[in-house]
Amino acid sequence: MTNIRKSHPLIKIINNSFIDLPAPSNISAWWNFGSLLGICLGLQILTGLFLAMHYTSDTATAFSSVTHICRDVNYGWVLRYLHANGASMFFICLYLHVGRGLYYGSYLFKETWNMGVILLFAVMATAFMGYVLPWGQMSFWGATVITNLLSAIPYIGTDLVEWIWGGFSVDKATLTRFFAFHFLLPFIISALVMVHLLFLHETGSNNPTGIPSNMDMIPFHPYYTIKDILGLFMMILVLLSLVLFSPDMLGDPDNYMPANPLSTPPHIKPEWYFLFAYAILRSIPNKLGGVLALVLSILILVIIPFLHTSKQRSMTFRPLSQCLFWLLTADLLTLTWIGGQPVEHPYVIIGQLASILYFLIIIVIMPLTSLMENHLLKW
């Protein structure tokens, strides 16, 4: 009799994806983040489902329903903070996952990479809408400022914004639809993840050397399941430390004040994981230009496979490209810091320089350096 995991039509798919999947024998801990992201998504859907049972998406009661969850629901505060800080862990894993792809040349699997970029946009949209739901000051003003950016689109902008708002300002209709979409999108993301994995399993995983590893593969289970569980424990340790010791560390104190359309907070800013894009948006003193730069800061990932000029896939043996990669990382951290600062000297000029450097490294310096390294190989 054949083993059921190899013959059953449903279990067979799981077996070929997570158990008998041939994986390169030398992939490092940087390959852990895919599974961690899957776990983050599951955690967010689960905690979100229980939160949705107690939340009301009405401007009059949204803020107090969140307070009710934290005070009166059994372990409601754990659910709320797991969900809020789980989003932060999600983005940490996402950015490290993308960074790994950039460093080791995984972007040359174009279908998988482009699917990943679509996933990144979907997760960002979901997180933005989720931030609006507690209906605090930063929720309301963040929603107003970010949705208002669409009015920069020529001709249809104003109509588009009012259509999204469901009125002439961010109000009850906006909150209700944001809740509906925030609930729906994670399930769409789950479907997109399946497609992402489908594309990945067509080609197989990349590895740190960037050299094809078809002749040296090992089964995913038990080797990488154990390795992934270690990564999972480390992530849970960080997440629980955040939730149980300083749950509000990554949040904004202004969001503990109920939304008031008549009082603007002194400094409107999004959650920390959007600050780098927000800094790029603010660095251009033109509304449409800023919006374009904001979208391009993420969309630029799509053209990266076409900017690959090196003869080697990975950066493992390319010291000059490595320096540029870490310069880009430092630049993104600088942008994240600037995004949280007020719009005044010297932050404005630092933000502008960091924004220019960001696009310059990706579009110009990196491809030229790769060409130079190709010539150095001939010596």
From Swiss-Prot:
Top-level taxon in the UniProt lineage: Eukaryota
Family matches, as Gene3D superfamilies: Cytochrome Bc1 Complex, Chain C
GO cellular component term, pick one: mitochondrial inner membrane
InterPro entries named among the record's database cross-references: Cyt_b/b6_C, Cyt_b/b6_C_sf, Cyt_b/b6_N, Cytb/b6-like_sf, Cytochrome_b, Cytochrome_b_C_euk/bac, Cytochrome_b_N_euk/bac, Di-haem_cyt_TM
Sequence positions that bind a ubiquinone: H201
Consequence when changing T329A: In clade 1A and clade 1B
UniProt-listed GO biological process terms: mitochondrial electron transport, ubiquinol to cytochrome c
Cofactor note text: Binds 2 heme b groups non-covalently.
Transmembrane segments: 33-53, 77-98, 113-133, 178-198, 226-246, 288-308, 320-340, 347-367
Keywords: Electron transport, Heme, Iron, Membrane, Metal-binding, Mitochondrion, Mitochondrion inner membrane, Respiratory chain, Transmembrane, Transmembrane helix, Transport, Ubiquinone
Binding site for heme b b566: H97, H196
Subcellular location: Mitochondrion inner membrane
Function: Component of the ubiquinol-cytochrome c reductase complex (complex III or cytochrome b-c1 complex) that is part of the mitochondrial respiratory chain. The b-c1 complex mediates electron transfer from ubiquinol to cytochrome c. Contributes to the generation of a proton gradient across the mitochondrial membrane that is then used for ATP synthesis.
Subunit note: The cytochrome bc1 complex contains 11 subunits: 3 respiratory subunits (MT-CYB, CYC1 and UQCRFS1), 2 core proteins (UQCRC1 and UQCRC2) and 6 low-molecular weight proteins (UQCRH/QCR6, UQCRB/QCR7, UQCRQ/QCR8, UQCR10/QCR9, UQCR11/QCR10 and a cleavage product of UQCRFS1). This cytochrome bc1 complex then forms a dimer.
More info: Heme 1 (or BL or b562) is low-potential and absorbs at about 562 nm, and heme 2 (or BH or b566) is high-potential and absorbs at about 566 nm.
Family: Belongs to the cytochrome b family.
PANTHER family attached to this UniProt entry: CYTOCHROME B
Name of the protein this chain belongs to: Cytochrome b
Organism: Pipistrellus pipistrellus (Common pipistrelle)
